[in-house]
């Protein structure tokens, strides 16, 4: 399985972004152009689907909905943060769409505005459904993160969970940060005859 197309709205510094994903993808641009933010879309889905993760955790570890949602969101897509991915698994084509909004009351938790799963043109999941409307707290969790609810599309959850990348809030490896640096003289000094040990 692999992602073949991605579209997102109100994601970090992007009002709207959409592109195909080939066998190999290069993301280039100047500093602060949003390259890391773009790649974080994939980590975001992994954090939702992974063990001990979930929607609330994925949003919280990025500083909350205000930090994740674009500054353009007030006048774009009703302020919803949306991620829409198309995936290919052999002969099977999948689509997963997640739209998130603020609860609008109390702690303003992130809640599911829309969750959609389509396989080969057949709609397997569309939320909110009747259960969600009768118990709105269910919308604080995606079905992607729930083993009891994602049986029909667990292969997507397993795929997202395999995304391997250093999380945005994870420090650089200690080996890189604290590796021993040689004294300046050792790094730039070329030994001459006086530095060499005498030979017999």
Regions found by a protein language model. Name each.
Residues 40-105:
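Conserved P-loop NTP-binding catalytic core
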Residues 27:
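Hydrophobic anchor at the beta1->P-loop junction of P-loop NTPases
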Residues 1-15:
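N-terminal pre-Walker A segment at the start of P-loop NTPase domains
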Residues 4, 17, 81-85, 96, ...:
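Hydrophobic residues positioned within well-ordered beta-strands of beta-sheet architectures
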Residues 31:
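The conserved Walker
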Residues 35:
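Conserved lysine of the Walker
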Residues 90-200:
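Electropositive, glycine-dotted interaction segments
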Residues 16-22:
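Phosphate-binding P-loop
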């Amino acid at each position: 399985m692999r992602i073949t197309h991605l579209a997102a709205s109100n994601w970090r510094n992007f009002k709207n972004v959409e592109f195909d994903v080939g066998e190999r993808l290069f993301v280039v641009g100047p500093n602060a152009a949003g390259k890391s933010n773009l790649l974080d879309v994939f980590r975001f889905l992994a954090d939702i689907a992974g063990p001990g993760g979930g929607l609330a955790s994925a949003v919280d570890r990025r500083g909350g909905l205000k930090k994740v949602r674009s500054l353009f969101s007030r006048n774009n897509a009703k302020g919803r943060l949306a991620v829409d991915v198309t995936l290919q698994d052999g002969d099977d084509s999948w689509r997963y769409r997640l739209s998130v909004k603020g609860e609008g009351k109390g702690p303003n938790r992130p809640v599911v505005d829309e969750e959609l799963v389509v396989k080969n043109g057949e709609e397997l999941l569309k939320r909110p459904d009747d259960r969600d409307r009768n118990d709105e707290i269910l919308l604080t969790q995606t079905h992607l993160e729930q083993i009891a609810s994602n049986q029909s599309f667990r292969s997507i959850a397993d795929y997202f969970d395999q995304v391997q990348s250093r999380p945005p809030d994870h420090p650089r490896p200690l080996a890189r940060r604290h590796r021993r640096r040689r004294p300046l003289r050792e790094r730039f000094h070329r030994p001459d005859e006086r530095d060499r040990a005498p030979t017999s």
